[in-house]
Amino acid sequence: RAAMKQRAAELRATKGVKGAAKKEKEAEACLAAIEALTGLDRQIAERFHVVVTEEAPDLDHKTWYGFPSYARDGKVITFVQPASKFDTRYTSIGFNEDANLDDGALWATSFAIVEWTPEAEKKLRALVRKAAAVRTEG
């Protein structure tokens, strides 16, 4: 229920705002969502924000149900789900349907992270690059 209220507030905040002004407002909301986090959730969200900014600079920064998220053409590609949001023992990095992660008949769309390590960053960088790649039909 809280997530639905957050999503409604996100939509209200950008109602009537278009173009670059809307993207700027959404990017500010993404940074505010990250800054509102604490501890490990914040550390992971901050580092993931850097990864997305560097590996997929064309993705727009916004919030989605209160989560820091990154989108193309208004469709969320990837997001951070803080552990504190649902009282879980790990933060999740999620990828939505428009992420280009297809790998045969089965692939993961969510990854648990309990600590930001060089190995985790390397894997997430590769996932973000792949997820953000524009699909080519053929």
Q: What are these language model-derived features?
A:
Residues 1-138:
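Charge-dense, helix-prone N-terminal extensions
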